UniProtKB/Swiss-Prot annotation:
Name of the featured protein: Ankyrin repeat domain-containing protein 1
Keyword Coiled coil on entry: yes
Organism of provenance: Xenopus laevis
Any one GO MF annotation of this record: RNA polymerase II-specific DNA-binding transcription factor binding
Protein's cellular compartments: Nucleus
Recorded GO CC terms: cytoplasm; nucleus
Superkingdom in the source lineage: Eukaryota
The UniProt record lists the keyword Repeat: yes
Segments forming a coiled coil: 37-77
Length: 318
C-alpha cells in the first residue's frame, strides 16, 4: 500500500516537472503568447458550444410559445355552427371595408377677391394680363373702353396683341372702337397680326374690322402677318380676300417682304393664291429681282472670302 502511494506521489511530481519544463521552454523560446492564445481559442470553443446549446433551447421555447398562441387563437375563433355565425362574419368584413374607404376632401371655394376702384393704368394692365374681373369692374363703374395712353394705345390694342379673345369680345361689346388707331396708325387687326392669335383675328373680322386697313407705313394686316411670320394669320387673311398685291409706303407688296425676310412658307402661300410677281417697288425691283439681288450679294461675299483665303495661302508659301 505504501509502495503504491509513493508511486502515485512520484508520478504526480513527474507531471508537475514536465509542466514546469513546458512553461519554462515556452518562455525561453518566446512563444508564451502563442500558447496563451491557443488556450484562449480552446476556451472559446467550449464557450461557444454552450452558447449554441442555450440559443437552441431558447428557440425551441419560442416555437413552443408561438404554437400555443396559435392554438389559442384558433380556439377563440367563432365557429360556424349555423348560418347566423356566417352572417356575423360577413357583417364584420363589410364594416372593415367601409372603414377603409377614404372620404374625398371637398375644397371650400376660395373667397372672391374684392376689387376696389380701377384706374386707367390698372385697366390697361388687366387687358395685358387677361384679368376679366378687373375689366368688368372698370366697365361696370362707367369706365371708357376707348381710353388710351400717351401713344394712343387702347386696352383693345393690348388684348389683341396678347390674344386674349374673351377680353377683346368684352371690350367690343362695351363699345370699344375696332378701327381706333394708335400713334403709328395701327388698328386692332394690325396688333393681332403682331401677336399671332388666329381666334382673335377671326373675332375681329366677324365684328367687321377693315381687312385692308393701313398704318402710318401704309402696311396692311397682311404685310404685318408676313413680316412676323404668323402663317395661320396670313392664310386666314388671304382666305378672307385680303389684298395680296397691296403696296406700302416703299412700294413693297407682302411678297416683297416675304422674299426680303426669307419667309419661305409665306412665299409659297402667296404664290399658291396667285400673287403678282411682276409688281415693282419704289426701287424698281420685283420680288424675283430681289431674290437675284440677294443671290448676287451673297456671291460677292463668298467670292471676296475665297480671294482673301487664296491670297493668304499664297503668302504663307513664301
Amino acid at each position: 500500500m505504501l509502495l503504491k502511494m509513493e508511486e502515485m506521489v512520484i508520478e504526480k511530481k513527474n507531471e508537475m516537472k514536465q509542466t514546469g519544463d513546458f512553461v519554462s521552454g515556452v518562455s525561453k523560446n518566446g512563444e508564451y503568447e502563442t500558447a496563451v492564445a491557443l488556450e484562449k481559442q480552446e476556451d472559446l470553443k467550449t464557450t461557444s458550444k454552450s452558447l449554441i446549446e442555450l440559443e437552441e433551447e431558447k428557440q425551441s421555447k419560442e416555437k413552443q410559445l408561438k404554437s400555443e398562441l396559435l392554438k389559442k387563437k384558433l380556439e377563440e375563433r367563432p365557429k360556424l355552427d349555423n348560418l347566423e355565425d356566417l352572417q356575423t362574419i360577413i357583417n364584420l368584413k363589410k364594416r372593415k371595408r367601409v372603414k377603409k374607404v377614404k372620404v374625398p376632401v371637398v375644397k371650400e371655394p376660395e373667397p372672391e377677391e374684392t376689387i376696389g376702384d380701377v384706374d386707367q393704368m390698372t385697366f390697361f394692365k388687366a387687358a395685358l394680363d387677361n384679368k376679366m374681373s378687373i375689366i368688368e369692374k372698370y366697365l361696370a363703374d362707367g369706365g371708357d373702353p376707348n381710353t388710351c395712353d400717351e401713344y394712343k394705345r387702347t386696352a383693345l390694342h393690348r388684348a389683341c396683341s396678347e390674344g386674349h379673345t374673351a377680353i377683346v369680345e368684352k371690350l367690343i361689346e362695351a363699345g370699344a372702337n375696332i378701327e381706333f388707331k394708335d400713334m403709328l396708325e395701327s388698328t386692332a387687326l394690325h396688333w393681332t397680326c403682331r401677336g399671332g392669335s388666329v381666334e382673335t383675328l377671326k373675332l375681329l373680322l366677324n365684328k367687321g374690322a377693315a381687312i385692308n386697313a393701313r398704318d402710318k407705313l401704309l402696311s396692311t394686316p397682311l404685310h404685318v402677318a408676313v413680316r412676323t411670320g404668323y402663317y395661320e394669320c396670313g392664310e386666314h387673311l388671304i382666305a378672307c380676300e385680303a389684298d395680296l398685291n397691296a403696296k406700302d409706303r416703299e412700294g413693297d407688296t407682302p411678297m416683297h417682304d416675304g422674299v426680303r425676310l426669307n419667309r419661305y412658307k409665306m412665299i409659297r402661300l402667296l404664290i399658291l393664291y396667285g400673287v403678282n410677281l411682276n409688281i415693282k417697288n419704289c426701287a424698281g425691283k420685283t420680288p424675283m429681282e430681289l431674290v437675284m439681288q440677294w443671290q448676287n450679294g451673297a456671291k460677292e461675299i463668298f467670292n471676296g472670302l475665297q480671294n482673301k483665303s487664296y491670297k493668304n495661302s499664297h503668302i504663307s508659301k513664301f
